[in-house]
Amino acid sequence: MAKSKDVRVAVILECTSCVRNGVNKVSTGISRYITQKNRHNTPNPLELKKFCPYCYKHTIHGEIKK
């Protein structure tokens, strides 16, 4: 029997501190990463600690809607 392809989905992670603080005055932009998640194992929105080149530090990146 064939497996369903809808289990793994692509998600976009966006820096929460850049969005909250407006954008850094030195360089404009918001850090975004693209990754995949398994909907069965992780039904809640994904949050990972990643490096933000605009904040120059590791910050929490949260899943956003497409």
Swiss-Prot record:
- One BP term from GO: translation
Q: Name one Pfam family in it.
A: Ribosomal_L33
Please classify the protein's predominant subcellular localization into one broad category: plastid
Q: Where in the cell is it found?
A: Plastid, Chloroplast
The record's annotation in InterPro entries points to:
Ribosomal_bL33 (IPR001705), Ribosomal_bL33_CS (IPR018264), Ribosomal_bL33_sf (IPR038584), Ribosomal_zn-bd (IPR011332)
UniProt entry keywords in alphabetical sequence:
Chloroplast, Plastid, Ribonucleoprotein, Ribosomal protein
Q: Organism's domain of life? A: Eukaryota
A GO molecular function held by the record: structural constituent of ribosome
Asked whether the keyword Chloroplast is assigned, the reply is yes
Q: Which SUPFAM superfamilies match?
A: Zn-binding ribosomal proteins
> In the record, which residues are listed under signal peptide?
none
**Name listed for the protein in its UniProt record:** Large ribosomal subunit protein bL33c
What is the organism field in this record? Ipomoea purpurea
